């Protein structure tokens, strides 16, 4: 037995937030600490085993130990990306260990040469792949008895299985991973009936538990005790009698409490006889029992043939395998009518080893490992069987001859798809947009599949970003030495090492995909592509790529993740709708008046603090620099700015009245800001609306969501107060290029004896109470004489030649720049003003930075599903039901698959037209010829024609203008109207057209594509 490195090392006390930040927002600190104390054993280092190990290492367990003494074979390279042809004959675990160890410096990886059941006691979780059922039973008998989590997984061609046994008394602390529900309450009766504020839905279910904070009239209810919920309606629920706490409560906040749940698992031996299934596809509800028998039969077949599985497409082996299945079904006394065709397909594919299946199953299994080690999220209970038979090609001959081994690295894939289909995969020309988490996984999968390795194949990948430390947790092609380098270049290099046949076959770009890069990703570029794959993190770019794919009639593979959730979509020309056909609802935003004057949630104060950061350290600096560098800046601002007064005052303050000459002056400036925002403005608000104010209807003004604030008096010994001064002074110094200090003694010395001027409330100050009122700034901007007076007081730019300020460009992941420090301090001070529970730096960073929670497990699952759809596109499948859009939530073991939505059709003069994919293809004719074509050939009268924002033709235009335009070619007309020459790379023009039919009725028609 080789050295088991650091299995018993001391627990990690601290978590590297810089590395794990995106994952921490999914799991939380407590779960991460538990994980970092858990040793994991992984048996089997083929494609599925290494995928599980890779994800578990990235996630950050205490240690990973590998067991696989089997020698590397050429066919292993179909899915095992850490093996090379030079490793053939060397034990798989021995080759893999050093590659896995590179993934995460905090996770030692070691190899064990021999396994004994007693040795298993070292581990919190044991994962078994590529292992006979007899051996699995031996291991599980021991793990079940000794409270060690056990997971078994197998990938056989387009079929896969997962089995979980976490013991009879597994405690799950959070069953769904959702943020606890929270809401504002209006009232609580002594019977415990809680009514929500302003008829907002509480979202709770019977049996949920909640706790209360900030409840008035019943202070005893704020003790943090979880209380069981009985739902009365969408806006009311009961917590049982609270008579002993008072007669009535009002205001306050409820927060859902996650209560631990006990889950009991059966052992493998019991589960073989009495299985419990998770159903991933409701269209295949009858298949899990078939697969339950078949996967046992595969092990029995291998036992009878010295470990060999049925040969690809071999009918003799398939017939024998079917007999094994019948025998097992009879022994277990299962009332299942075996589907002979389906069962034999499993035999045909048993030696298949597909990286797409390994990625999908490996991501799902790794998440189960994390559940076992953290007790967070609901486990798969207990059998999960999956197939993607729709991916089996029909465009090529699949036979024993075409699927037999070739002695090449793709033999595991050829065993399923055949050698002819392998050539199709090698000939692909693909475009990957994004080389982040999903992009890395996609490139790895393509390298194993042999995508674009043929003579005519090519991969283009673009990503404008550089690698950051936080990327390393899930973008597994990158290493710490790559931080600062370009993602597209590093990813391309990494996969070319995995599969040397890709050397020279990948072109990496650093351009953002958008209108500005159409000179690079133009007509010629898109016309050569077989398909496009999105690996993007924003909707705008996705929509743009989608439009380009529709225009060039290219298939698009779309996917995304959010924490443990993920989705995939396949877009097929002339068959499915496009990505842009349906859109997510817009992101919720907070009313301005709520943020400015009436916050009631910590999210409100964080958003306010984020705006304050921009308003103090970014926007005014930009205005100053524009004033100093642009001669017409003032004139333009007075005409176009929504708040010209603020722009002018910013320039005056930052150049004259508040310009610091030393860091000490920056400290004093920060102190003034404290009084302004957390004392004076609050006093002014209370002057306008005293705490006993009533509305026009006689109701208390400060009630419901409006909380009466309390001014803060500065105390240098209060940590939040001091943190604000340090962050604000440091950022202000950064703007002016002054050296900042962190020594508290300096701040105490500067601020000693400072007495702020007493606050004097101002009359006539208007405060916006609701969204319907005019913002007070609007009125202030109407005094043109005062605006001119401020403008005249500014120093001329000529007196400050060469002087510039440095704006603070918000960067959430640099802990040394004071950005999150400032926002956290400002948000929490405002929370103190309004009696809102403050948030720590971690939560503040999440909200202010709009961080998208991410897990390497979800990314792996998504990439696997996308590649299963890619195979269908290569095959050219024509039936919409053969494609699948997928959605999953690994936290609750939910997988759903649906047929894509068909592209909508319409009829124009009796002719059926596809609303998305059809277009009128015309040469660069004259405007008159175009109008005549539609009149004669389509029976339509053109009423309007445009290109982008340029109106080319309208039937109501003056006759003189029409006479000038009708003889011009479309390209000439566009150039004349836009006053710009068409770019040389452009081969097409897109025109939007409005038409009437013979009855004068407006008709919806597709766009026109003019070929130049």
From Swiss-Prot:
The active site is at 593 (glycyl thioester intermediate). InterPro entries: E1_4HB, E1_FCCH, E1_FCCH_sf, ThiF/MoeB/HesA, ThiF_NAD_FAD-bd, Ub-activating_enz_E1_C, Ub-E1_IAD_1, UBA_E1_C_sf. Its main location: cytoplasm. Its EC number is 6.2.1.45. Ubiquitin transfer between the E1 ubiquitin-activating enzyme ptr3 and E2 ubiquitin-conjugating enzyme ubc4 is enhanced by the presence of magnesium and ATP, or adenylated ubiquitin. The modification Phosphoserine is found at residues 264, 903. ATP binds at residues 22, 437, 463, 471, 474, 487, 513, 537-538. Mg(2+) 2 binds at residue 537. One of its GO terms (molecular function) is ATP hydrolysis activity. Monomer. Interacts with the E2 ubiquitin-conjugating enzyme ubc4. E1 ubiquitin-activating enzyme that catalyzes the first step in ubiquitin conjugation to mark cellular proteins for degradation through the ubiquitin-proteasome system. Activates ubiquitin by first adenylating its C-terminal glycine residue with ATP, and thereafter linking this residue to the side chain of a cysteine residue in E1, yielding a ubiquitin-E1 thioester and free AMP. This is Ubiquitin-activating enzyme E1 1. It comes from Schizosaccharomyces pombe (strain 972 / ATCC 24843) (Fission yeast).
């Amino acid at each position: 037995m080789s050295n088991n490195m650091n299995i018993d090392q001391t627990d990690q006390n601290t978590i590297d937030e810089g590395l794990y930040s995106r994952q921490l927002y999914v799991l939380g600190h407590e779960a991460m600490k538990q994980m970092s104390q858990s040793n994991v054993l992984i048996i089997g280092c083929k494609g599925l085993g290494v995928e599980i190990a890779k994800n578990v290492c990235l996630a950050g367990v205490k240690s990973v130990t590998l067991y696989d003494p089997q020698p590397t074979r050429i066919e292993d390279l179909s899915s095992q990306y850490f093996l090379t042809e030079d490793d053939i004959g060397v034990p798989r675990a021995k080759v893999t260990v050093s590659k896995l160890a590179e993934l995460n410096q905090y996770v030692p990886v070691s190899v064990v040469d021999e396994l004994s059941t007693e040795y298993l006691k070292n581990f919190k979780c044991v994962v078994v792949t590529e292992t006979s059922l007899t051996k699995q039973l031996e291991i599980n008998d021991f793990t079940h008895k000794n409270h060690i989590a056990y997971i078994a997984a197998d990938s056989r061609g387009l079929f896969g299985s997962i089995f979980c046994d976490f013991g009879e008394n597994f405690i799950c602390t959070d069953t769904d991973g959702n943020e606890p529900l929270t809401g504002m309450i209006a009232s609580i009766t002594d019977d415990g009936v809680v009514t929500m504020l302003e008829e907002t839905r509480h979202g709770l279910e019977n049996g949920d538990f909640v706790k209360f904070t900030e409840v008035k009239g019943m202070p005893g209810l704020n003790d943090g005790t979880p209380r069981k919920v009985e739902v009365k309606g969408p806006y009311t629920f009961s917590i049982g009698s609270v008579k002993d706490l008072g007669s009535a409560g009002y205001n306050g906040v409820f927060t859902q409490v996650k209560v631990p749940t006990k889950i009991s698992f059966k052992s493998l031996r019991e589960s073989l006889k009495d299985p419990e299934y998770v159903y991933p596809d409701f269209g295949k509800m009858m298949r899990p029992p078939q697969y339950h028998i078949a996967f046992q039969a595969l092990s029995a077949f291998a036992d009878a043939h010295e470990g060999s599985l049925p040969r690809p497409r071999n009918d003799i082996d398939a017939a024998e395998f079917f007999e094994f299945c019948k025998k097992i079904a009879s022994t277990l006394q299962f009332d299942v009518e075996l589907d002979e065709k389906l069962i034999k397909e499993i035999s045909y594919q048993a030696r298949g080893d597909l990286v797409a299946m390994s990625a999908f199953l490996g991501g799902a299994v790794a998440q189960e490992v994390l559940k076992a080690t953290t007790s967070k999220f609901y486990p798969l209970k207990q059998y999960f069987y999956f197939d993607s038979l729709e991916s089996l090609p029909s465009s090529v001959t699949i036979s024993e001859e075409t699927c037999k081994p070739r002695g090449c690295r793709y033999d595991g894939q050829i065993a399923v798809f055949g050698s002819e289909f392998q050539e199709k995969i090698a000939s692909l020309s693909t475009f990957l947009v994004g080389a982040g988490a999903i992009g890395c996984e996609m490139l790895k999968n393509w390298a194993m599949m042999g995508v674009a390795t043929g003579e005519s194949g090519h991969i283009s990948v673009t990503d404008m970003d550089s690698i950051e430390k936080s990327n390393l947790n899930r973008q597994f092609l990158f290493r710490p030495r790559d931080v600062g380098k370009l993602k597209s270049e590093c990813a391309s290099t990494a996969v070319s090492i995995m599969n040397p046949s890709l050397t020279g076959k990948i072109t990496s770009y650093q351009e953002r995909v958008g209108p500005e890069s159409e000179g690079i990703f133009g007509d010629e570029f898109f016309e050569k592509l077989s398909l496009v794959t999105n690996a993007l993190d924003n909707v705008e770019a996705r929509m743009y790529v989608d439009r380009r794919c529709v225009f060039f009639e290219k298939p698009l593979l779309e996917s995304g993740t959010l924490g443990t959730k993920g989705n995939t979509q396949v877009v097929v020309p002339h068959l499915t709708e496009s990505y842009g056909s349906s859109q997510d609802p817009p992101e919720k935003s907070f009313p301005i008046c709520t943020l400015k004057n009436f916050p009631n949630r910590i999210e409100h104060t964080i958003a306010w603090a984020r705006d304050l950061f921009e308003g103090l350290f970014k926007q005014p600096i930009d205005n100053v620099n524009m004033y100093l560098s642009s001669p017409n800046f003032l004139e333009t601002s007075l005409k176009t700015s929504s708040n010209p007064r603020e722009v002018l005052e910013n320039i005056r303050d930052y150049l004259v009245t508040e310009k610091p000459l030393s860091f000490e002056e920056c400290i004093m400036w920060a102190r003034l800001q404290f009084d302004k925002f957390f004392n004076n403005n609050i006093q002014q608000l209370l002057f306008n609306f005293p705490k006993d104010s009533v509305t026009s209807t006689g109701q208390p003004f400060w009630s419901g969501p409006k909380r009466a604030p309390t001014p803060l008096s500065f105390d240098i010994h209060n940590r939040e107060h001091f943190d604000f001064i340090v962050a604000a002074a440091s950022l202000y110094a950064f703007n002016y290029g002054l050296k900042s200090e962190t020594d508290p003694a300096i701040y105490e010395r500067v601020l000693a004896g400072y007495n702020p001027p007493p606050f004097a409330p101002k009359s006539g100050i208007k405060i916006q109470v609701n969204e319907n009122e005019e913002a007070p700034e609007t009125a202030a901007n109407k005094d043109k004489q005062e605006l001119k007076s401020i403008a005249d007081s500014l120093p001329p730019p000529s007196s400050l030649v060469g002087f510039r300020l440095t704006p603070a460009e918000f960067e959430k992941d640099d802990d040394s720049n004071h950005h999150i420090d400032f926002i956290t301090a400002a948000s929490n001070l405002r929370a103190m003003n309004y009696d809102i529970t403050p948030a720590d730096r971690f939560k503040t960073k999440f909200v202010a930075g709009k961080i998208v929670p991410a897990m390497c497990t979800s990314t792996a699952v998504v990439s696997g599903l996308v590649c299963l759809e890619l195979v269908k596109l290569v095959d050219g499948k024509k039936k919409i039901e053969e494609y699948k859009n997928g959605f999953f939530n690994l936290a609750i073991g939910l997988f759903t698959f649906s047929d894509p939505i068909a592209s909508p059709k319409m009829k124009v003069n009796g002719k059926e037209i596809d609303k998305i994919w059809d277009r009128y293809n015309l040469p660069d004719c004259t405007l008159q010829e175009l109008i005549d074509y539609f009149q004669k050939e389509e029976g339509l009268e053109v009423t309007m024609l445009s290109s982008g924002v340029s109106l080319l033709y309208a039937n109501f235009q003056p006759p003189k203008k029409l006479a000038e335009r009708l003889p011009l070619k479309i390209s000439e007309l566009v150039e004349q109207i836009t006053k710009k020459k068409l770019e040389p790379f452009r081969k097409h023009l897109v025109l939007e057209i409005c038409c009437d039919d013979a009855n004068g009725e407006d008709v919806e028609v597709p766009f026109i594509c003019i070929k130049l």
